Amino acid sequence: MNEIKCVCDANIWIDACHCDAEVDYLNEYSVVGFAEQVHNEIVKFQSNNDKFSYIYNKYVANQTSYEILKTSDLGDMEAHFRHELSLKGFTDIDNSQKNIKNLGEYASLYFAYYLKIPLIHSTDLDFIQQEKERMPDIEIITWNEICEKISYDDDDRLKKNKIIEKKKQEMNKKKQEIDSSKKQFLEKN
């Protein structure tokens, strides 16, 4: 396994892809690690037959620039990893069949802790506030801090963030449409 500089949450990857900055991101932080739970979250975009499948396509196109962190990589610490996740209420730690809220963040944090990776990248501000005091040796970095590093200047950073916000709105709208369709289907049956 290459020397991993940081562990990346799915939302950071999605944001980088939205503004076509994934290569800059991977180059800035090489080598990036993705917890297998985050990997499974990103792979779900493969089945999207819509304009957001590029998130998965970019992930595959750049697979030589990152490592997937598997629980088996933890060796003797795997039991502790699973125990920590169970204390947070996670019993299913695969996350390939459904979206388990915050599993990716916690799995990333515990991988960083057990593998002694000093940085975790996350957009979840509540998670960051809750966990940063608990594990002070791990620095949690937000998208805005990352974007500042990989942008040419403030105008470029603002442009990237504007694109990301627009794409997030589109994704949320699509999710609401899907949820509404599911609800209507269930009500009919």
Positions of the model-derived regions?
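Active-site-proximal, substrate-binding regions of enzyme catalytic domains
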Residues: 2-115, 128-189
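Short acidic/polar active-site loop segments enriched in Thr and Asp
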Residues: 118
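Short, ordered loop/turn segments at secondary-structure junctions
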Residues: 125
